[in-house]
Amino acid sequence: MARFVVAALLVLLCLSGLEAIQHAPKIQVYSRHPAENGKPNFLNCYVSGFHPSDIEVDLLKNGKKIEKVEHSDLSFSKDWSFYLLYYTEFTPNEKDEYACRVSHVTFPTPKTVKWDRNM
């Protein structure tokens, strides 16, 4: 019985230690296909390497939140960090600016990464 209690306490300590670890997300914004003005495409925001899992991701058009956005299920890597993909259909042109805004406990304020049509 005593061994069980000790083992249970060790497991709890390990799990609580995982919550104390914080890793800032890496944010990558890119289109599925090379950008061509007037041609439908998909805008992707891949957020990876973050911990803990609580995160808020928004895709933006000219600084305003795009409402029709889909995302993958929250997944984790071998190192227990998390990753997600947010995406939406869009039609690029010369005047509109697209970006991904991420809020996470590791950022004092939300971080915004602009889409570079040449990447």
Curated annotation (Swiss-Prot):
State the signal peptide span: 1-20
Q: Which Gene3D superfamilies match?
A: Immunoglobulins
Q: Which residues form the Ig-like C1-type domain?
A: 25-114
Q: Keyword Transmembrane helix on this protein? A: no
Name the InterPro entries on file. Answer: B2Microglobulin, Ig-like_dom, Ig-like_dom_sf, Ig-like_fold, Ig/MHC_CS, Ig_C1-set, MHC/Immunoglobulin
Q: Which Pfam families match?
A: C1-set (PF07654)
Q: Which family does it belong to?
A: Belongs to the beta-2-microglobulin family.
> Which PROSITE patterns would you find in this protein's record?
IG_LIKE, IG_MHC
| GO terms (BP aspect) | antigen processing and presentation of peptide antigen via MHC class I; immune response
Q: Which residues pair up as cystines?
A: 45-100
Cite the entry's keywords alphabetically: Disulfide bond, Immunity, Immunoglobulin domain, MHC I, Secreted, Signal
User: Its quaternary structure?
Assistant: Heterodimer of an alpha chain and a beta chain. Beta-2-microglobulin is the beta-chain of major histocompatibility complex class I molecules.
Q: What is its main location?
A: secreted
- List where in the cell it is found: Secreted
Gene that this sequence comes from: B2M
Question: Which GO cellular component terms, listed alphabetically, does the Swiss-Prot or TrEMBL entry include?
Answer: extracellular region; MHC class I protein complex
State its role.
Component of the class I major histocompatibility complex (MHC). Involved in the presentation of peptide antigens to the immune system.
Please identify the protein, giving its name as recorded.
Beta-2-microglobulin
